[in-house]
Amino acid sequence: MDGTPGHDDMPGQPAPSRGESLWAHAEGSISEDVILAGARERATDIGAGAVTPAVGALLCLLAKLSGGKAVAEVGTGAGVSGLWLLSGMRDDGVLTTIDIEPEHLRLARQAFAEAGIGPSRTRLISGRAQEVLTRLADASYDLVFIDADPIDQPDYVAEGVRLLRSGGVIVVHRAALGGRAGDPGARDAEVIAVREAARLIAEDERLTPALVPLGDGVLAAVRD
């Protein structure tokens, strides 16, 4: 015995639940290289959101499983999620990433260059995602990743499903909203929008969905 108090011995510090322990283990099990760490630091500096390492690893896996030749991303941030997606894509795969903030796109371009990713492998588009997505071709993407304002999730989901080829995957981050999405008493605009996006996916007979408890909730679905 070393005399160090455990969770049960520390006043005011209840032991974490099993779910909390599993989440902490999953989130702490993934390490990032110096390129990703730098992109994450820049994202923090400018207040841009970034997926957790565990969500990033999931994106890499899904990009690889889906074929990873053509991927679309809504919400570039500083390039953290883009780096993870590209790491799972084919060597000739192209990431199309959309953000309304020029500074986000600049930092993402910097991150991709630092990772040795050539300009032919990325297409960075500045603009409102609702408008840009309508210009992308039907059934042309292996994966569509949505990590943007929860209010707009229903619009992005509708367009994202249209973009998927057969066997393609749509991935929606911030599907839990810190647990509020599953709280029957929560009825604010963000919660309503996130629930509507989840309903659109659940009721689409072409999709097979699953909700993954990583980051702020990841809703993924594969198209038949």
Curated annotation (Swiss-Prot):
* Keywords per UniProt: Methyltransferase, S-adenosyl-L-methionine, Transferase
Q: Does the keyword Methyltransferase apply?
A: yes
The GO molecular function terms of this record are: O-methyltransferase activity; S-adenosylmethionine-dependent methyltransferase activity
User: For this UniProt entry, which segments traverse the membrane?
Assistant: none
What CDD domains does the annotation carry?
Answer: AdoMet_MTases
Supply the enzyme class, top level: transferase
Annotated region (Disordered), positions in chain? 1-21
Stored InterPro entries: Cation-dep_OMT (IPR050362), SAM-dependent_MTases_sf (IPR029063), SAM_O-MeTrfase (IPR002935)
Enzyme Commission no: 2.1.1.-
Q: List the record's Gene Ontology CC terms alphabetically.
A: peptidoglycan-based cell wall; plasma membrane
Q: Where is the composition biased (Basic and acidic residues)?
A: 1-10
Q: Could you give the cofactor binding note from the entry?
A: Does not seem to have metal cofactors; no metal ions were found via inductively coupled plasma atomic emission spectroscopy, and the residues that bind metal in homologs are not conserved.
Q: Name one process (GO BP) from the record.
A: methylation
Active site per database record: H173 (proton acceptor)
Name the residues that bind S-adenosyl-L-methionine: V51, G75, V80, S81, D99, I100, H104, A129, Q130, D147, Y156
Gene3D superfamilies (alphabetical): Vaccinia Virus protein VP39
Q: What else is known?
A: Was identified as a high-confidence drug target.
Return the similarity comment: Belongs to the class I-like SAM-binding methyltransferase superfamily. Cation-dependent O-methyltransferase family.
Q: What does this protein do?
A: Probably specifically methylates an O atom of its substrate.
> Subunit composition?
Homodimer.
**What protein name applies here?**
Probable O-methyltransferase Rv1220c
**Which species does this protein come from?**
Mycobacterium tuberculosis (strain ATCC 25618 / H37Rv)
